[in-house]
Structures are given as C-alpha cells and as structure tokens.
Amino acid sequence: MSSVVVVGTQWGDEGKGKITDFLSENAEAIARYQGGNNAGHTIKFDGVTYKLHLIPSGIFYKEKISVIGNGMVVDPKALVEELKYLHDKGVDTSNLRISNRAHIILPYHIRIDEADEERKGANKIGTTKKGIGPAYMDKAARVGIRIIDLLDKETFKEKLEHNLGEKNRLLERFYELEGFKLEDILEEYYDYGQQFKEYVCDTSVVLNDALDDGKRVLFEGAQGVMLDIDQGTYPFVTSSNPIAGGVTIGSGVGPSKINHVVGVAKAYTTRVGDGPFPTELFDTIGDTIREVGHEYGTTTGRPRRVGWFDSVVVRHARRVSGLTDLSLTLLDVLTGIETLKICVAYKLDGKTITEFPASLKDLARCEPVYEELPGWTEDITGVTSLDDLPVNCRHYMERIAQLTGVQVSMFSVGPDRAQTHVIKSVWRLA
C-alpha cells in the first residue's frame, strides 16, 4: 500500500494539476477530496492542453480509477458540461467514480453567492461566484442535497421544495432578487443526474479497497493551504479544507493510510482575489513574472497578484499539513532576474516573527524580511536533472529547502510533462 497527498502550499495555482498528472503515471487511483469547480487545473496530455475544474487529473489514464470524493461540492450542470468537453476531445471517462455522498450546487447557491459578494462591496472576499460557499453552508446546516438524493426524483423534489421556500425568501426579501420556481430546477437537474448516474457509487469503499489491495492511490487537493477555512487567511479563504487533513474527511480514507504529503510551491508566490499578501510586488519585476508565468486565473481569467517566495507561508503549510516533500514549480519563470529575494521572516512592530500570524490586522502591519540571492541567466527549460541546473538555481532551491524545513523532491522548469524532474521518489514506502 502506498498513498500520496498533493497539496498547494500557497494560495492555490501552484501547479498541482501538473504535478498530480505527472504522479498519476505511477498511481492506480486518483481522487479529489474537497472544493468544486472553483478550482482550475491545466494539464497537457499527449500534446493537447486540457482545462479541468471538477474531474480529477487522472481521467486521462483509462486504466486508473478517477474519483470525485464525498468532500467535494458538485455542480451537476458543470459536471455534465465537463464530461461533454472531454468526450468531444475523444477522452474515455468510463474510469470516473463519483461519491454518492458528495453535495450538489444548485442555481440558488450561485445566485446567492453572486448577490452576497456584490453586497459586501469593499469588503468582498474575492469568491469565484460558483456557489461553493453557499453549498457548503447548506451542508453544515444539514439542509444540503447530495448526489444520492439527486438520483431519486421523489427525494430530490421533496428536499428541493423545502429549500426553495427558504432560499426564495432570502433572495426576494434580503437581496431583492427574483427567486426560483420548482419547475425551473427539478427536471433540468434531475436529468443532469441521470446523465452521470453510471459513475455514482460509494467511493470510500473504492479507495479503501484499492489501498487494501496494495495499490497506489493519489489524492489531489484543490486551492492551497493559505485558502484553508481553518488554517488560511480567514475570511479570505475557501469554504473547505485543502490541507492534508481534509483527505480523511473528504475521501473516507483513514489517516493511518496516508504515507506521504507533497507540498507544491511556485518558485515565487501568487494570489487571486482579495486578502493579505506580505511579499506582493507592485513593480516591473512583478509585471515580468506575471507575463512570463502567464499568471491569469484558470477559472476566472483574473490577473494573479505576484510576489517573492515566502518561506513563512510554506513553513506554515509544512506544519499544518505535515509535508514530507516539496515540489518546486515554475523555476524557469525566474530566469533572467538578476537578484532574487526570499522572505525569511516578518517584522511586526519592530519585532521579528517567523510564524504566520492569525490576525489580519497584524498581517497588514507585517513587513517581509528578505534574503537576497543571485539569479541565473541560463535557459533551464531543457535540463534533464538537478545537476544540469545552473549553480545559482541549485543554491536557490537548497535555500528554500533549508528555510522551509522540507526536502525538495521534485522540480519543474516548464509546462510539459518532460519538464518535471524527480530528485527523490514520493512513492517510496518510507
């Protein structure tokens, strides 16, 4: 038995999809455990670029099981559209398994999400407006509708009718928006469920059986540790737990069955949406990194905020997710920058702190303490091993490992699979 969790160590968009796709080659089952279609994964497979939001990266390997876990919130319409997108490109999806316990996103979740973000004005969180938060709210309030409910028309109608009474009052009286009629949703969404019911099962059984049979299972996180609802920059976070601990809740696999946790980190830092970002750059270097790194959101298309690598953030990720390995991505983007900076600590009211603070007021007053390292000018996109990297690039990676306390086991120097390189296998048994 061998299992690996892939988590983002920053604010998402670290290249998890690419690393998951790379590691999928040696996995026999790949599972997502939280989030929904608010997360975007860009994957290159056989020379074709795919953009996925719900379906795990492992879908391209038809001999491997690809799982949408119970911790996810699934927009049935978006799922049907994504399946069609893959089918139109000739991708076989018969290896997909969808948890019957996953909750669904309905049109009223999306409308409430949009209205609430608009209402907050300057205090907006930066949600993708996909209905994720309201769906998780219903789940916590025990009024959510699960996929197993969607497949039974009588149950779906009963639960939907009950929820619409409350949601319409909220939309009409508080947000002053039009509500929904039962018939607006019932037939359309029941039909969506019928289109993917062949994939629906108890995915906890599927995953545990695979592990008990000695198979390799890969768990694919969405977003990143700093967007975790408990450990991130609350309230500028997502509504679920992207940290490694979310795997056990969101997949139905116990913690004793997790072997390694791979933290994916960009060689710099980015963030989409509002919220604190201590190392953010507002100069030409930031603009250069954004353009060279194509730093625009997969889901929203919004320009990402860009900053220097922050070891305080990744140390926090190491601690709360129990990172065993680090995968450093987009090293090639930094080529040509004369002097690189790594944030080693923060200054808060004249005092040096080395751990990420919980208070947003404290964060707003934090000034990054930088260590400067010489950059490199050599093209590294064609290297095939660690030894091929320029000495300054290797020193940069070594310093990141020292400052974060996590070994760099993989690094990436471009978007293609062949540009991801292994220093130490994360599939090791010890």
UniProtKB/Swiss-Prot annotation:
Binding site for GTP: 12-18, 40-42, 304, 330-332, 412-414
Binding-site residues for IMP, renumbered to this chain: 13-16, 38-41, 128, 142, 223, 238, 302
Subcellular location: Cytoplasm
Cofactors, names only: Mg(2+)
Superkingdom of the organism of origin: Bacteria
Cofactor binding, per record: Binds 1 Mg(2+) ion per subunit.
Keyword annotations from UniProtKB, A to Z: Cytoplasm, GTP-binding, Ligase, Magnesium, Metal-binding, Nucleotide-binding, Purine biosynthesis
GO biological process, one term: IMP metabolic process
Binding site for Mg(2+): 13, 40
Claim: Ligase is one of the keywords in the record: yes
Reaction it catalyzes: IMP + L-aspartate + GTP = N(6)-(1,2-dicarboxyethyl)-AMP + GDP + phosphate + 2 H(+)
Molecular function GO labels: adenylosuccinate synthase activity; GTP binding; magnesium ion binding
Main location: cytoplasm
Record: active site: 13 (proton acceptor), 41 (proton donor)
Pathway participation: Purine metabolism; AMP biosynthesis via de novo pathway; AMP from IMP: step 1/2
Gene Ontology CC annotation, any one: cytoplasm
Segments crossing the lipid bilayer: none
Binding sites annotated in the UniProt record for substrate: 298-304
Enzyme Commission identifier(s): 6.3.4.4
Family as reported in the entry's similarity comment: Belongs to the adenylosuccinate synthetase family.
Its job: Plays an important role in the de novo pathway of purine nucleotide biosynthesis. Catalyzes the first committed step in the biosynthesis of AMP from IMP.
Subunit-level organization: Homodimer.
Name of this protein: Adenylosuccinate synthetase
